[in-house]
Amino acid sequence: MKDLLKFLKAQTKTEEFDAIKIALASPDMIRSWSFGEVKKPETINYRTFKPERDGLFCARIFGPVKDYECLCGKYKRLKHRGVICEKCGVEVTQTKVRRERMGHIELASPTAHIWFLKSLPSRIGLLLDMPLRDIERVLYFESYVVIEGGMTNLERQQILTEEQYLDALEEFGDEFDAKMGAEAIQALLKSMDLEQECEQLREELNETNSETKRKKLTKRIKLLEAFVQSGNKPEWMILTVLPVLPPDLRPLVPLDGGRFATSDLNDLYRRVINRNNRLKRLLDLAAPDIIVRNEKRMLQEAVDALLDNGRRGRAITGSNKRPLKSLADMIKGKQGRFRQNLLGKRVDYSGRSVITVGPYLRLHQCGLPKKMALELFKPFIYGKLELRGLATTIKAAKKMVEREXAVVWDILDEVIREHPVLLNRAPTLHRLGIQAFEPVLIEGKAIQLHPLVCAAYNADFDGDQMAVHVPLTLEAQLEARALMMSTNNILSPANGEPIIVPSQDVVLGLYYMTRDCVNAKGEGMVLTGPKEAERLYRSGLASLHARVKVRITEYEKDANGELXAKTSLXDTTVGRAILWMIVPKGLPYTIVNQALGKKAISKMLNTCYRILGLKPTVIFADQIMYTGFAYAARSGASVGIDDMVIPEKKHEIISEAEAEVAEIQEQFQSGLVTAGERYNKVIDIWAAANDRVSKAMMDNLQTETVINRDGQEEKQVSFNSIYMMADSGARGSAAQIRQLAGMRGLMAKPDGSIIETPITANFREGLNVLQYFISTHGARKGLADTALKTANSGYLTRRLVDVAQDLVVTEDDCGTHEGIMMTPVIEGGDVKEPLRDRVLGRVTAEDVLKPGTADILVPRNTLLHEQWCDLLEENSVDAVKVRSVVSCDTDFGVCAHCYGRDLARGHIINKGEAIGVIAAQSIGEPGTQLTMRTFHIGGAASRAAAESSIQVKNKGSIKLSNVKSVVNSSGKLVITSRNTELKLIDEFGRTKESYKVPYGAVLAKGDGEQVAGGETVANWDPHTMPVITEVSGFVRFTDMIDGQTITRQTDELTGLSSLVVLDSAERTAGGKDLRPALKIVDAQGNDVLIPGTDMPAQYFLPGKAIVQLEDGVQISSGDTLARIPQESGGTKDITGGLPRVADLFEARRPKEPAILAEISGIVSFGKETKGKRRLVITPVDGSDPYEEMIPKWRQLNVFEGERVERGDVISDGPEAPHDILRLRGVHAVTRYIVNEVQDVYRLQGVKINDKHIEVIVRQMLRKATIVNAGSSDFLEGEQVEYSRVKIANRELEANGKVGATYSRDLLGITKASLATESFISAASFQETTRVLTEAAVAGKRDELRGLKENVIVGRLIPAGTGYAYHQDRMRRRAAGEAPAAPQVTAEDASASLAELLNAGLGGSDNE
């Protein structure tokens, strides 16, 4: 017995490991894995079904087919364990060794491994520095390659055709050595001296100047060094021995009817063995060269197909014309080993069923059908029955449960009590898609779900199904209860707002309950308290909506956190007083003293959580729900067709619009407007008409006139059911009501363009055939879009998770002083997001000072919670520098201070939290709500773009930033800088509005002046760009020669003449090199200098510029010298929605990106080429000027002689994130990506916290390119993990050496995932072959840092509750202790023993 226990212990031991290394296998290594050579292609004997000897399933090589039994049956039973049968040669052992024992095939001729040959860049090609085409010609026996030139004029690695080879043979005899096939390549690889080659290349690298050559050399050096360091030998890329997969991993399964289903691998192996054996025979017979060669080529192709079918030439197909699945196909793709079996395992103990509503459940409960619970909790019931002595054996217990005896139900009740179960709804888009509940047994067959958690699951009850999982171990139950219980997940991890919010009926009920109504029964009473209000309502003496006075007792927390009561008489309604009874103590009465809509209820729950904490909030949420349901039922709100009131004015509005359209049509026919303008105008007219109709309709629905107590008419908010549903936020929106009772409006074609005839009818009037047909267009597009959107959104989430999966909070504080400035998001006149929303839950990076003083308001390293934010608002701070994950200094991971508050819990984040995955889920989950289409902005929107003035909305004072300006003759400011911003500051010093002011705008008010709301503060001409003079004086033309550089035009209407500068293409030969300009001189004819510089005021004019001055006229500063017409951009497509988010995270370059200044300096233009002009920026300090060629059609924002700063926009367009990173730095690119992504989500009304996007940006900035290696081991131009460079530099600086300089790289998320340090994670993501090839050649080690790698190797993840386990492992490793031996308990031992004996008895026990 003791012996047996020891044996059992040995069976369960797993190796502790820290890292996984991948490398090339040497032939000796393959032989050492192998248990014997497979010599025959046979599989099993068709009569006896026993494996053939030496075949692909041979029992002698791979092990016995039955447990502890040899093939011929001489030795059976456990007692012969380890004996090798002398008759059949099979070792007596467990049959599971057939899953792990490998065989091998000795190849008669070496063959190249296709991965190292064909996976680009070809490793063999790179190593030998030969083109892939040549290597292929050698390998597939079309050409010879010279291996040793000897004394001849043949070079090593020279390719010879058959004829050339024969000629050379005649000429030189056997002085040289040339071969073909894999042997030749093997010989070349073998004879390479890697170290020497490396030295030589490094020397070449230092000498060469050409960029392409440098790149090529660096690539080769990296590969050679990888070989040297990893200990791989180049010749191992050529196979001489082929390993054979264990047979149980490529099984042969008998189907009924005597046929067999086989794995494709067996076919592929059979081909290889057949060809190999044939080749051996041919070599023994010394067959003619050409036959042997053909056989060798066929063997090479067979091995190729086995390793990666279809990579070269046509894929080998099986009997049914389907390509065979090779070894490479087994591991890659969605159905491959990684994604199907390692990352997507199935879970035991689960049931699934349809869900229904459980309106009487508490928040932490779910209803579980009895039948289901009985099945799921079987093991626990068996155990309990035995423990109570109600059943003697498991088998008896099983019988009792099957009989469903009465005692079983009692025991089920006991077992289930306090045992949480997990509920999951697919698709699980974020972590709230799986939550734990305590089961309540119910009759019926459907799971009951608490209505408030539906939002988190995105569940509805139209037939959705959910899965139930039972956590078995104590630890699992603990985690489910402490972390996953629905009551612990009240806030959404994406934005920190409550996600347990009432919706639909509950909202409608509460809204109905808290509305007031004029002259309702009982109006004007004074009540002693909510109890009396309820009594009066129940006894029918007062209406729910009656306006009354009630004595209310509020409780408020004082400084010590004690509750202090305060009683007052409040004007309120009966319904609100009744609702007050369920509000927990500590909240103010004002919270319910209003008509409660969805937003207000959400805010109420949020306030409750922040003030009172978790428990009262959960109880409150449940009470809200019960009350809401009760009063929604009492309200009797229902929808009738008469509720959709069509406004009387609708008819006249539509006829007015039709008249306007007819007028435009006439103008078009008489040629006054173009077709495009007509289309845009028509659409604008209809859009405006639609708005007017819907406004009339909403005004109509919104109010009703009633008689009050004094007999006068009074308007009040209407009790129309449809309006109440929309107003409360329960269901529907103004846009939907507009289609019911207004007009349906303009419809879009499937390509996104708008049909110019709108649907003037609404659903109440009904649609005619044409209108109905137009509607189907849009409806179908909606469905098609949804299907596409789901797939795209899922793929985006997958990429995001993959790039961020290894980011975990690993330390408390990294101590950095870096951070990003947070300012409110202001677009035009609206504050889109106030500062408090942006900084809430972040940690300050430096002290926040009270504006205008040196007093510290908030010290650095403070977590800004609600109270701090109130303080910031009171002092109207408008910029705070906060810590950010992008600037965090932790090496592998992030520190808690840089991340800030854990949004789902409301306190600073814990160590071990997997913030990367949370960020990815938070961004990906709303993905399906984003739109798919690109917006064709025509009509209304493009007109808004051509603004010509700024009109402020609020009163306040003006503040200008980055401004250069001159004062013109009428005393107004004229802007002469490019990126001026105008902000409106209110009396508290808060920024309310912000606008961009273009060059040449005339300001009505100066910096710091007061303005009133609605005042126009700036004007400009949107269609031309002016050239403004900064000095006063007289105009002097230079190089303005009529007919050569300029031409005179006269306007027919006004009779004024103007000069137009010719484009250099249109000029005569003499005018090509002239540069027309306007110079400003004083009365004596001397140059006037631009103030503050020593440059003469001379303005060069680009082509097409229009000058309306004559030579010698007097002008004053701020006047317009010339105008450059701007082509209006036409209707540009604006990528919106999901594709835009994907573009940003993939860091794709836009089509025509903005051109930014690479350095600071003075702009001038050099010699032009045919289609481009040469822009030269000369630095002020006299270093080398920077030149760039810019296509002629790009509009430039800068004039000659202007000063630009690095990163300024030279030509407008969408900015490329890579340029922003290079020229303006990490913080600028973070800000850009965060703001752009937020714009898309904000448009859809989705709230996501900035830090999630920052987390992804941090991962995109993970790599750096070495600019100068210093004393480090890096190569120039090499791309390295940013943290690696930091660590290396730290060590070098500690030793007083020079560190490497580097530039940060921005990689798209796909690129970044594939470029991670972990090859396991990258291989399981995409491009498996390429990743594994690269890793094997470099002999990479995977340190198993991320979550994915650990899941794949089957360990706890180093995050969450697994974080402690990994910390403990690290600590023990550092202390050098052995891991604690797994203790085998008596139960384990007896269980394994029973299993063993059962197996040994040949499975006679068939219960």
Swiss-Prot record:
One MF annotation (Gene Ontology) recorded for this entry: DNA-directed RNA polymerase activity
One Pfam family named in its UniProt record: RNA_pol_Rpb1_4
Keyword tags: Acetylation, DNA-directed RNA polymerase, Magnesium, Metal-binding, Nucleotidyltransferase, Transcription, Transferase, Zinc
SUPFAM superfamilies: beta and beta-prime subunits of DNA dependent RNA-polymerase
GO biological process, one term: DNA-templated transcription
Binding annotation for Mg(2+): D460, D462, D464
Binding annotation for Zn(2+) 2: C814, C888, C895, C898
Ranges in a coiled coil: none
Signal peptide: none
Domain of life: Bacteria
Enzyme Commission code(s) on record: 2.7.7.6
Gene3D superfamilies attached to this UniProt entry: 1.10.132.30, 1.10.150.390, 1.10.1790.20, 1.10.40.90, 2.40.40.20, 2.40.50.100, RNA polymerase II, clamp domain, RNA polymerase Rpb1, domain 3
UniProt GO cellular component terms: DNA-directed RNA polymerase complex
Cofactor(s) required for function per UniProt: Mg(2+); Zn(2+)
InterPro entries: DNA-dir_RpoC_beta_prime (IPR045867), DNA-dir_RpoC_beta_prime_bact (IPR012754), RNA_pol_asu (IPR000722), RNA_pol_N (IPR006592), RNA_pol_Rpb1_1 (IPR007080), RNA_pol_Rpb1_3 (IPR007066), RNA_pol_Rpb1_3_sf (IPR042102), RNA_pol_Rpb1_4 (IPR007083)
Function (record text): DNA-dependent RNA polymerase catalyzes the transcription of DNA into RNA using the four ribonucleoside triphosphates as substrates.
Subunit structure and binding partners: The RNAP catalytic core consists of 2 alpha, 1 beta, 1 beta' and 1 omega subunit. When a sigma factor is associated with the core the holoenzyme is formed, which can initiate transcription.
Family named by the database record: Belongs to the RNA polymerase beta' chain family.
Protein name from the UniProt record: DNA-directed RNA polymerase subunit beta'
Species for this entry: Escherichia coli O6:H1 (strain CFT073 / ATCC 700928 / UPEC)
